[in-house]
Amino acid sequence: MKMKEPVTCNRSTCNSPQAITLSIGILFAPAITFRLNGTYWNKDQKYSGEYTISKEGKNLILHSSSGTQIVPDHFTLTPENDETTNFDLLNVMIGINFHWQRTEDQKFKGTLKIMDEGKHLTAINILPLEDYLLSVISSEMSATSSLELLKAHAVISRSWLIAQKIKSEKLTDTYQSCIQDEQQYIRWYDREDHEHFDVCADDHCQRYQGISKAYTPFVQQAIEATRGEVLVYDGEICDARFSKCCGGVTEYFENTWEPVNHPYLTKVIDSDTQSSTPDLSQEENARKWILSTPDVFCNTRDKAILSNVLNDYDQETQDFFRWQVSYSPSELSALITSRIGIDFGEIQSIEPVERGVSGRITRLRIQGSKRDMIIGKELVIRKAFSQSHLYSSAFIVETEKDTSEAITRFTLKGAGWGHGVGLCQIGAAVMSDKGYDYKQILSHYFPGTQLESIKNVNSSVSFAATSSINRGGAGKS
């Protein structure tokens, strides 16, 4: 039995959700242990049971209870029966570099591929798009979330994934992802960092934890009810993004990732009653906003709603809407050096240079006894100011001084959890609880978009039966 080749996605093959097959990077380690629950094939040899694969010299060695075997550096195991077989990956790291980082064993359907990437081995799962989505919306959120919220997330995740596959085919080196000299360190990250698979399984892309998470009837119903549906803007499938909590206002795409304008990833006030805010790119307005508690969807402490939208480890985070952290100058100096590799010496001042429309800092000036430098974008800032990742870059800085005017404490007071671009998961959960349907939720967070069946997205980027999403008063941008 030969390995099934994954189907690539382009304008001619992406017209059916069943035709799209994905490759997901799951585990990156010097050795990988897995358990095959059923019969799997590599060419004409079959495998079942528990194995460990490691690199010894230039060879990949497969270890089992019956002995060892040299295998190719692209070792693929294809299930004999897609419906009844699955495999376990042991000690998978999730939440990498975030405050919820931990390891767990995970179960997957589909094909398993082990690759030698030099510094480590990579375990890749290959499976159909709709099977992937079943796991994603259970992994990103609680599987007990409301049906309308799950439907909205299914559309977003499907749209984002297909947009990434199309983008990767067209991607050229038209922009830099890092600008660094003596005066600045500006960097942004995205999924094109992955060369040998479409997306990873962690928060860097979308959480994908296999079939380990509970599938409820609502999850399966959400996938079936939206099967093949994508968000479209101006004839293109949307690069739909999401974060946990926008903090009250969503952010521009280009303030977080590459300098590309997506009109549907814009400033949205997370409210059905508040139609405007002050210009949060201005420092004084941002300060007042961050120190306030505006009446917006994501400003909730309703435990029932939060338990329905957040997984167990996400619920360990309580103060996501407004939060604060505090450091001594020496603590902060050591933290920044360890996190981004730049030694500022004794930190003397922290000054926002540029903010986005949500109040998130995109460029931050740090003055120290050894150097004066600007860092950005938001993920670099969040990385620099936390052992994992700061909740968001929408923060103000307050300093405490002793009687000699020496700084004794830096306190960061912030808003939101995540980059704030696109759908706000907690805000969307509140909208669902208030009775908004998934079309209204999508319309609120992605203004100007249309909901379309992928089969109507053809090579000429025209649509057979495009209909606008009913905006339903779900909020204004």
Give the predicted meaning of each segment.
Residues 1-477:
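Conserved, single-site charged/polar hotspot
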